[in-house]
Amino acid sequence: MSYDVAIIGAGVSGAMVARELSRYNIKVALVEKCSDMAMGTTKANSAIVHAGFDAMPGTLKARLNVEGTAAMPGLCETLHVPFKPIGSYVVAFSNEEVETLEELKARGEENGVPGLEILDKEAIHREEPNLSDEAVAALYAPTAGIVCPYELTIATVENAVMNGVEFFRNFDVTAIEKNAQGNFCLLYTSPSPRDTR
């Protein structure tokens, strides 16, 4: 079999790439070494959709983090996957840690994260009454949320497959070689290699 693109790995990242490429008139294979999708790194995902204040300003990670977080509610709605926009707190237990919160807030604002605010002791205990009495402040990021990484990956792969992507399980790629025609060939533990341009 021959494909224009082969995506190695059916975790959340591979699934998203497959879904995006399924919008084009190309033949796409999504290959996964495990018996199903989301069985590698994705299974250990914390489910947190981070607001974007951690990444260093000006980096690709910072830009994609903020753009991805903004896109997540709409993506989840389209794929019928629950997204919970619960926000997040980074809690400080000393004045020195409050300085770190201020640095994170400034970094987040430079990255374009909307709505960041530092809450004082009274405000955080009003919002989170079970929080330790030792907490003195918190950075609140309203755009953070949670989504089940399994549900998101499964829905994304299903959408890609409905749009023409072919999904192969138990497909452990052991090498990538160029064949006589100049195409790349995936060598794997099953018979008959898959060619890709």
Label every PLM stretch briefly.
Residues 5-29:
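N-terminal Rossmann-like FAD-binding beta1-loop-alpha1 element of flavoenzymes
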Residues 23-41:
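Glycine-rich FAD pyrophosphate-binding loop
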Residues 26, 113, 165:
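Short phosphate-binding/catalytic loops that engage adenosine nucleotides
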Residues 47-127, 136:
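Dinucleotide-binding Rossmann-like beta1-alpha1 core, especially the glycine-rich loop
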Residues 82-92, 125-163:
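Helix-loop-beta segment of a Rossmann-like dinucleotide-binding subdomain
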Residues 96, 131-135, 178-185:
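A short, glycine/Asx- and small/polar-enriched loop/turn
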Residues 143-184, 190:
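Helical element adjacent to the flavin cofactor pocket in flavoenzyme catalytic cores
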Residues 188-197:
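Single conserved hydrophobic/aromatic residue that forms the stacking wall/gate
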